[in-house]
């Protein structure tokens, strides 16, 4: 892999991360925020794979597996919270679960 290819992959990874963060901040539905968070986590995962391929070592693949494991745990906890909130509040709007009164 050349330096130009690495740069392209890093730009793509940064774009995925930025799109995910924008989705988390812009959407009000909890389920859409979870999906956007998964997109945001795929950015660093792609960066780990690209950096590992550029340097020719397997540490990038190990970090990718760690990122996938973290993302799977996040989805499991997030979906459980989503179902609990939807049953309790009757809505999937993130503003509905705010405990602040005012």
UniProtKB/Swiss-Prot annotation:
GO CC list: NADH dehydrogenase complex; plasma membrane
GO annotation, biological process: ATP synthesis coupled electron transport
Function recorded in the entry: NDH-1 shuttles electrons from NADH, via FMN and iron-sulfur (Fe-S) centers, to quinones in the respiratory chain. The immediate electron acceptor for the enzyme in this species is believed to be ubiquinone. Couples the redox reaction to proton translocation (for every two electrons transferred, four hydrogen ions are translocated across the cytoplasmic membrane), and thus conserves the redox energy in a proton gradient.
Transmembrane segments annotated in the record for this chain: 6-26, 30-50, 63-83
Protein name: NADH-quinone oxidoreductase subunit K
Enzyme class: translocase
A Pfam match: Oxidored_q2
GO MF annotations in UniProt: NADH:ubiquinone reductase (non-electrogenic) activity; quinone binding
Quaternary structure note: NDH-1 is composed of 14 different subunits. Subunits NuoA, H, J, K, L, M, N constitute the membrane sector of the complex.
Compartment(s): Cell inner membrane
Catalytic reaction annotation: a quinone + NADH + 5 H(+)(in) = a quinol + NAD(+) + 4 H(+)(out)
Keyword Translocase belongs to the record: yes
UniProt keyword list: Cell inner membrane, Cell membrane, Membrane, NAD, Quinone, Translocase, Transmembrane, Transmembrane helix, Transport, Ubiquinone
Membrane protein topology class: Multi-pass membrane protein
Family as reported in the entry's similarity comment: Belongs to the complex I subunit 4L family.
Originating species: Rhodopseudomonas palustris (strain BisA53)
UniProt-listed Enzyme Commission number(s): 7.1.1.-
């Amino acid at each position: 892999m050349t330096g130009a290819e690495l740069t392209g992959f890093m730009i793509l990874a940064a774009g995925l991360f930025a799109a995910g963060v924008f989705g988390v901040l812009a959407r009000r539905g909890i389920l859409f925020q979870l999906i956007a968070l998964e997109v945001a986590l795929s950015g660093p995962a792609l960066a780990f794979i690209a950096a590992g391929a550029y340097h020719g070592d397997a540490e990038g693949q190990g970090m990718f597996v760690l990122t996938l494991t973290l993302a799977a745990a996040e989805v499991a906890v997030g979906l459980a919270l989503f179902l609990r909130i939807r049953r309790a509040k009757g809505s999937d709007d993130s503003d509905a679960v705010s405990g602040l009164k005012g």
